[in-house]
Curated annotation (Swiss-Prot):
Cystine connections: none
Catalytic activity: L-arginine + H(+) = agmatine + CO2
Name the record gives this protein: Biosynthetic arginine decarboxylase
Enzyme Commission designation: 4.1.1.19
Residue(s) carrying N6-(pyridoxal phosphate)lysine: 99
Organism of origin: Bacteroides fragilis (strain ATCC 25285 / DSM 2151 / CCUG 4856 / JCM 11019 / LMG 10263 / NCTC 9343 / Onslow / VPI 2553 / EN-2)
Cofactor: Mg(2+); pyridoxal 5'-phosphate
Statement: the UniProt record of this protein carries the keyword Lyase: yes
């Protein structure tokens, strides 16, 4: 049998598919990250080892700001290429919706590198608006205000516009337009108004219902006409500068995007024909990320198009409609936060221990006085072959069910039950192995690999770090970061350390559809085994919750140059005291309560003075330590 190669691991985990140019495997069998073409490749295993020496423990979130920069440059370059190809005569504006990842270092990096591309920000709520208007954006950059708005929201936006910010208030509901008109008159400012249009077209994938007739936001055609009449009656026709639509996040099919663009372009044409000189078309989000690397429209975790194709269709559709009707090309706004941020963050955690289903020892023989069910099941296992495996499977299931029923009635003992279990799972393993080599195996055997998978218990919280995996079954690329020059000898699901049965990952990227287990290696004594989850830079940090009071993980910012990498910043994860404070437990009061209890216990002779001191020392140390296992 030939030796396992790096290329085999690349194919097994499809890293060349989802990793684009950022992720790969080096000659050591370690995952490497290459944020920039002219920069070095960062060895994740060596990075984790270095961070351990700095007392930065896993789980950790590693951010690569250079990848953010590259994503911005790539999107801008695609617009430049498409503009030249289709004779586009207006401007394009890349907008980052901060809801995708509101973490200050992420927003600041995007703004800092995006200034030369006129990159702007989008706020979808009042708190987000407070953050956005205080960020040092370029004077030509746009700020798009979406979401529901009250008087204080609108006043804040209008006054910021009065002081020089290029702010657009996008009307989601008719009552907002009336509120904007009243507030603008009071503040003596001519507002930049946008209107979100509810298209009949919708996206595809998990967020399909975000667009179309069932969408939460936007004005229907009838409501749009009402809004136009209102603006005309108030002498505010010139205030309508922008139309906006959104057909859903992570649109999997480019055809759906094309359909929506054609529909939206006609709104732009019709508004110009009615005397409303709209200058901007905000095509919203939807630009997807190929999480599984299949470039397939049938997978909700993939897309069947590239950034360049998305941009080409956006520009060509609007240019074509404008030219045919003799009107100016609109400035095009895109709100593609997921595509900008997903790739830049990697979650890394350690496997703590494993659990495997029991099996019969090949050298073990049954005693002459063993229960008849044990003897019968042993006979099935001992004579199992391909010709009789279906019958053997049925018989084994029947015997196991009978044994469990007898145990429940107190007829067979615990030792007999354990023997039945070991034999049953050994039979199941052998049948699965035989079936795996068949071209057409019986349907009954399809789920056996999933059933037999080991459980790898990992030091992280699914609810804190990968909420979309739990909430919407989002599939992320997951793989070990080391030993990739070795053939994996186990299959496993990943279990987190929360006290919740939902805290597990049982869907993984596969060369064929979705796998219910991941190929992994057996653990070695005194050698940490690390697993990484990739493309987690969009939504995961901000949506994570404190189930079981597991807080934010340690976070590390790593930059690269042509000579090496630099650990720019280490952000400590939350302590036990910090998460307890969130749920209104005062750490100081907790310590005082424990001190009183310990003093009382010492006086009553329940523990010694030394034991009391040791207990309090451990309590204080744990209180100000990491929420994860150390």
């Amino acid at each position: 049998m030939r030796k396992w190669r790096i290329e085999d691991s690349e194919e097994l985990y499809n890293i060349t598919g989802w990793g684009t140019s950022y992720f790969g495997i080096n000659d050591k069998g370690h995952v490497v990250v290459t944020p920039r073409k002219d920069g070095v490749a960062v060895d994740l295993k060596e990075l984790v080892d270095e961070l351990q020496l700095r007392d930065v423990a896993a789980p950790m979130l590693v951010r690569f700001p250079d990848i953010l920069d590259n994503r911005i440059e790539k999107t801008a370059y695609c617009f430049k290429q498409a503009s030249e190809e289709y004779g586009y005569k207006a401007q394009n504006f890349i907008i980052y919706p901060i809801k995708v990842n509101q973490m200050r270092p992420v927003v600041e990096e995007i703004i800092s590198h995006g200034k030369k591309f006129n990159l702007g920000l989008e706020a979808g709520s009042k708190p987000e608006l407070h953050a956005v208007i205080a960020v040092n954006t370029d004077s030509d950059s746009l700020i798009i205000c979406n979401g529901y708005k009250d008087e204080s929201y609108i006043e804040l936006a209008l006054l910021a516009q009065k002081m020089g910010k290029r702010i657009f208030l996008v009307v989601e509901k008719m009552n907002e337009l009336k509120l904007i008109a009243r507030m603008a008159k009071q503040l003596n400012v001519q507002p930049n108004i946008g209107i979100r249009i509810k298209l009949a077209s919708s996206g595809s994938g998990k967020w399909e219902e975000s667009g179309g007739d069932a969408s939460k936001f936007g004005l229907t055609s009838s409501e749009l006409l009402e809004a136009l009449d209102f603006l005309e009656s108030k002498g505010m026709k010139d205030c309508l500068k922008l139309i906006h639509f959104h057909i859903g996040s992570q649109v999997t099919k480019i055809r759906r995007i094309k359909t929506a663009l054609r529909e939206a372009s006609q709104f732009y044409v019709q508004l110009h024909a009615m005397g409303f000189n709209v200058e901007f078309v905000d095509i919203g989000g939807g630009l997807g990320v190929d999480y599984d690397g299949t470039r397939s429209s049938s997978s909700e975790s993939s897309v069947n198009y590239s950034i360049q194709e998305y941009v080409n269709d956006s520009i060509s559709t609007l240019v074509d409609a404008s030219d045919k009707n003799g009107i100016p090309h609109p400035n095009i706004i895109t709100e593609s936060g997921r595509a900008l941020t997903a790739h830049h963050s990697v979650l890394i955690f350690e496997v703590l221990e494993t659990a495997t289903l029991p099996q019969w020892d090949d050298e073990e023989e049954i005693a002459p006085d063993a229960h008849e069910l044990v003897q019968e099941l042993y006979g099935i296992w001992d004579t199992l072959n391909q010709n009789k495996m279906l019958e053997a499977w049925h018989d084994a299931q029947q015997i196991r069910e009978e044994a469990l029923d007898l145990f429940s009635h107190g007829i067979v003992d615990l030792k007999t039950r354990a023997q039945i279990e070991r034999l049953y799972w050994s039979i199941t393993r052998e049948i699965n192995q035989i079936a795996g080599g068949l071209k057409h195996a019986p349907d009954e055997f399809r789920g056996l690999s999933k059933l037999l998978a080991d459980k790898y218990f990992c030091n992280f919280s699914l609810f804190q770090s990968l909420p979309d995996s739990w909430a919407i079954d989002q599939i992320f690329p997951i793989m070990p970061i080391q030993r990739l020059d070795e053939k994996p000898d186990r299959s496993a699901t990943l279990q987190d350390i929360t006290c919740d049965s939902d805290g597990k990952i049982a869907n993984f990227i596969s060369t064929r559809n979705v796998a219910h287990y991941m190929p992994v290696h057996s653990l070695k004594q005194k050698e940490p085994y690390y697993v990484a989850v990739f493309l987690v830079g969009a939504y995961q940090e901000i949506l994570g919750d404190m189930h079981n009071l597991f807080g934010d993980t340690n976070a590390v910012h790593v930059s690269v140059n042509e000579k090496g990498y630099n650990i720019e910043q280490i952000i400590d994860g939350e302590t036990v005291a910090e998460v307890l404070d969130y749920v209104q437990y005062s750490p100081k009061k907790l310590v005082r309560t424990l001190e009183t209890w310990v003093t009382k216990s010492v006086k009553e002779g329940k523990i010694s003075v030394e034991e009391g001191k040791e207990f309090l020392s451990n309590y204080r140390s744990g209180l100000y330590g990491y929420t994860y296992l150390e």
